Amino acid sequence: MEIPFPTLSVALPDSSLIDSKSLLEKSLRVAQFARALSIFRVEKVYVYHDASSTVRPDDAKLITLLLEYLDTPQYLRKLLYPKMKLLQFAGMLPPIQSPHHKKFLRASEIRGEESRAGVLLRDRGKWVVDVGLDRTVPFVGKTETTRKANFKLSVKQGQ
C-alpha cells in the first residue's frame, strides 16, 4: 500500500541569488534548489520579491524560468524553450530525475496505461502529442492548451 505524500508548497525569495554574481553561478544555485524541491516532492513553488534586499530585477524571472525548464522532461525542452540568454547555461545543469520525467521509449514498449508529459502539436491538419516516444501519437479528446500537459496513453487490444 502506497502512502500518499502531503501537498507541499515552498516560497522562494528572489534574494536567494543575491550572493551569486554571474549567470552561471545563479543557474547552478537554482539547479540545487530544483533538486531539493524534487527530492521532497514539492508541488508548488512561489517566487516572491524580497523588498528588504537589493536584487537584480530579472532574478525572480531567472528563478522561475529555470525551475520550469528543469521541471520539463528533457525530450520536451527544445519544443518549449527557444534559445535565450537566461537559459545560456541550462544545458550544463544536471537533470533532476523527477518521478514524472520518463525516459525516451519506442511506442511498442508502452504496456497498458501510462501517464506522460507531452505537448499537443498540429500535424497535417490533425492533433498529435509528442510524449517522448519514437513517434508522435494521435490525440483523442478535447483540450485548450498546446503547452506542456500530462497525457494518459493506453494501448488498444491487439497492438
Q: Which ranges hold each PLM region?
A:
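Post-transcriptional modification and biogenesis factors for structured RNAs
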Residues: 1-159
